[in-house]
Amino acid sequence: MALIIDGRKVAAAIREEVKSEVDRLKERGIVPRLAVILVGEDPASVLYSRSIEKACTRAGVEYELFALPAGIPEDDVVALLSRLNEDGSVHGIMVELPLPKQMNRQKVLEAVSPVKDVDGVHPVNRGYIMSNSEGLFPTTPMSCIEIMLRNGIEIKGKHAVLVGRGESVGKPLVYMMLNQNATVTVCHTFTNDLAYHTRQADILVVAVGKAGMITGDMVKPGAVVVDAGINEAKDGGICGDVDFDSVARVAGAISPVPGGVGSLTTTLILKNTLKAIRLQGGKV
């Protein structure tokens, strides 16, 4: 049976680190502050904003939610972001996705200052990933890296196969894995014989949004399997892209859903907020 990679345990450790850093900043008169912009009432976004607020409260980070109506003009959202960019008391800004269909997603996201972009969605920060420079990076691919490194799983020199090339996880994770000195193969919709490629992986990361698509016969014995997918299960709960039971019998280590990658995302938003303070000229 595979080692179960416990994302909740990793998240708890990072929360303690964040809390300690927040306390040190407050001793110097710096109170970390995160602004979250929620346009409309998407249920998942509302729930996520509440989980971020809870994480902020526990860590001692100030939290401000800007809940805007779905019909608000795009220019008004951009104007709000401009004000927050100029507000020195705001260290991190996050725009909840998805935005209403009538809005230009890219225009809104590019209106966030790169040094306050705690969700790592600005093109400048995406460029920093590619160039292996210091920036603010998206939290789900960060979670994939963190849960491996903090469980003593070596990435350097390993063959990593990524299934999925989405903007939020797959594409940034390609460069994050390269920056960890892995050899990376990317599989996607048009990849022929997916199972052939997945069976070559020392590390297999899956993020496609298709429940149970990776089964035990598609995994190399002893491989590390990181499931970054999230789907609605038949019983009404959530499940990942990996068929957990069959893969756990073959893999050397596996992250579950829930309890794996997703456990870290809100905590890493706070970690990015502290990093943003440093990028803005403060010291953490």
Swiss-Prot record:
<comment type="similarity">
    <text>Belongs to the tetrahydrofolate dehydrogenase/cyclohydrolase family.</text>
</comment>
<dbReference type="GO" id="GO:0004488">
    <property type="term" value="F:methylenetetrahydrofolate dehydrogenase (NADP+) activity"/>
</dbReference>
<keyword id="KW-0658">Purine biosynthesis</keyword>
<protein>
    <recommendedName>
        <fullName>Bifunctional protein FolD</fullName>
        <ecNumber>1.5.1.5</ecNumber>
        <ecNumber>3.5.4.9</ecNumber>
    </recommendedName>
</protein>
<dbReference type="InterPro" id="IPR046346">
    <property type="entry name" value="Aminoacid_DH-like_N_sf"/>
</dbReference>
<dbReference type="Pfam" id="PF00763">
    <property type="entry name" value="THF_DHG_CYH"/>
</dbReference>
<comment type="pathway">
    <text>One-carbon metabolism; tetrahydrofolate interconversion.</text>
</comment>
<dbReference type="InterPro" id="IPR020630">
    <property type="entry name" value="THF_DH/CycHdrlase_cat_dom"/>
</dbReference>
<dbReference type="Pfam" id="PF02882">
    <property type="entry name" value="THF_DHG_CYH_C"/>
</dbReference>
<keyword id="KW-0511">Multifunctional enzyme</keyword>
<comment type="function">
    <text>Catalyzes the oxidation of 5,10-methylenetetrahydrofolate to 5,10-methenyltetrahydrofolate and then the hydrolysis of 5,10-methenyltetrahydrofolate to 10-formyltetrahydrofolate.</text>
</comment>
<comment type="subunit">
    <text>Homodimer.</text>
</comment>
<dbReference type="GO" id="GO:0035999">
    <property type="term" value="P:tetrahydrofolate interconversion"/>
</dbReference>
<dbReference type="InterPro" id="IPR000672">
    <property type="entry name" value="THF_DH/CycHdrlase"/>
</dbReference>
<keyword id="KW-0560">Oxidoreductase</keyword>
<dbReference type="GO" id="GO:0004477">
    <property type="term" value="F:methenyltetrahydrofolate cyclohydrolase activity"/>
</dbReference>
<keyword id="KW-0486">Methionine biosynthesis</keyword>
<dbReference type="GO" id="GO:0006164">
    <property type="term" value="P:purine nucleotide biosynthetic process"/>
</dbReference>
<keyword id="KW-0028">Amino-acid biosynthesis</keyword>
<dbReference type="GO" id="GO:0000105">
    <property type="term" value="P:L-histidine biosynthetic process"/>
</dbReference>
<dbReference type="GO" id="GO:0005829">
    <property type="term" value="C:cytosol"/>
</dbReference>
<keyword id="KW-0368">Histidine biosynthesis</keyword>
<feature type="binding site">
    <location>
        <position position="230"/>
    </location>
    <ligand>
        <name>NADP(+)</name>
    </ligand>
</feature>
<feature type="binding site">
    <location>
        <begin position="164"/>
        <end position="166"/>
    </location>
    <ligand>
        <name>NADP(+)</name>
    </ligand>
</feature>
<dbReference type="InterPro" id="IPR036291">
    <property type="entry name" value="NAD(P)-bd_dom_sf"/>
</dbReference>
<feature type="binding site">
    <location>
        <position position="189"/>
    </location>
    <ligand>
        <name>NADP(+)</name>
    </ligand>
</feature>
<dbReference type="GO" id="GO:0009086">
    <property type="term" value="P:methionine biosynthetic process"/>
</dbReference>
<keyword id="KW-0378">Hydrolase</keyword>
<keyword id="KW-0521">NADP</keyword>
<dbReference type="InterPro" id="IPR020631">
    <property type="entry name" value="THF_DH/CycHdrlase_NAD-bd_dom"/>
</dbReference>
<keyword id="KW-0554">One-carbon metabolism</keyword>
